[in-house]
Amino acid sequence: MPTWTEHIFYKKTGRIPSPGDVVEVAPDLVGFHDLTGYHVLEVLEHMGKVEVFDNEKVVVAFDHLSPPPNQRAAEIMVYIRRHVKSLGLPHFFDVGGGILHQIILERYAMPGQVIFTADSHGNTAGAVGAFAHGMGATDIAAALKLGKTWLVVPAPFKVEVRGEFPPGVMGKDVALHLLGQFGAEGFNGYSVEVFVERPKVFPMDDRATVGNMSTEMGADALMFIPDAVTAEYLKTARGVDYTPPSLEPGNYADKYTVELGRLEPLVAAPHSVDNVKTVREVEGVEVDQVFIGSCTNGRLRDIATAARILKGRRVKTRCIAIPASYEVFKTAMKLGYIDVLTEAGCVVTYGTCGPCLGGHFGVAGPGEVHLTTSNRNFKGRVGHPEAKIYLANPAVAAATAAEGRIADPRPYLKH
């Protein structure tokens, strides 16, 4: 029987290609945002007439420079809006709509689709079993104009997930565990297929975190094999009926098993995503700012976890919390999570990538220590190159904000 990766490529090419084959693939969806969209549209202009193969299959979101923090950013947005209008693109999310990857996940992505984005973290949509792959501006422009582009077929790698999350452990810790085991770029040339033994214990929001950080692992894609959680998510979020496939074991290049019960809260210490330590090893490090959000950890379960820990407390360091989309913000507000966070002293705003890329709304200064739920911690990622960046899950982030130093969240979750 074919693997899920082979199944997807068979649907697109009419054959099961071998790893390393170069194939042409027609995407089901193409996405870009303000930071990359300018370059994508410039390439289209150089190719002649600015046109897209199917305006219903294009998603555009303003998230990186949103709202525009300077004149140049405002000029870029004016330029993109003009093209969005002239092309008649209906799936456009202006300032306040949210982060592109979250929007695609909650509104559009379906199991078995092929999705290309002009951003490396488009693989977030792998949470629902889509082959989601980031590309540069030139390749995205070609895909938009021609309705197809080339891919090197990756080798399938199977990850089995067993057990259930202990208190204080989340999807971020699965991602950090894999990074610690295989290293940054350890999955180069692979399409990672994740099978969850007990689907209900691994929520969709946590799956999205793992898919998102597969970029840091070097994976071409990471897909959770569709199951009951996938079907429930699609029904609840969009009213779509979906029946998960019954897959027989396929032939994989390699396999690995994650035992959730053996994990504990993990932290990626400066200055590499694979410099992974347990929270106990870095506990007590004083922190200047905490960021809870991003396309990695700005979903409802992330915000709810932070609110649970911070309820009735005041933060002892700067704390910025950003839900990843308007839908997440709206739901978090209805459930009271936004009130809890603001009363705790957090600065809360709508979906923007600002702090994650060191662009605005919380840039790191020289010598500062930042703990963030985002996905990268190399020098200069969140601002000044002399800043130190730690990556962790939202529970660790909230506990750290409560204490002003890196803290184990488990004592906060005992009752």
UniProtKB/Swiss-Prot annotation:
One of its GO terms (biological process) is L-leucine biosynthetic process. InterPro entries: Acnase/IPM_dHydase_lsu_aba_1/3, Acoase/IPM_deHydtase_lsu_aba, Aconitase_4Fe-4S_BS, Aconitase_4Fe-4S_dom, HAcnase/IPMdehydase_lsu_prok, Homoacnase/IPMdehydase_lsu, IPM_dehydratase_rel_enz. Keywords: 4Fe-4S, Amino-acid biosynthesis, Branched-chain amino acid biosynthesis, Iron, Iron-sulfur, Leucine biosynthesis, Lyase, Metal-binding. It catalyses: (2R,3S)-3-isopropylmalate = (2S)-2-isopropylmalate. Its cofactor is [4Fe-4S] cluster. GO terms for molecular function: 3-isopropylmalate dehydratase activity; 4 iron, 4 sulfur cluster binding; metal ion binding. [4Fe-4S] cluster binds at C295, C353, C356. Pathway: Amino-acid biosynthesis; L-leucine biosynthesis; L-leucine from 3-methyl-2-oxobutanoate: step 2/4. NCBIfam families: hacA_fam, IPMI_arch, PRK00402.1. Heterodimer of LeuC and LeuD. This is 3-isopropylmalate dehydratase large subunit. It comes from Pyrobaculum arsenaticum (strain DSM 13514 / JCM 11321 / PZ6).
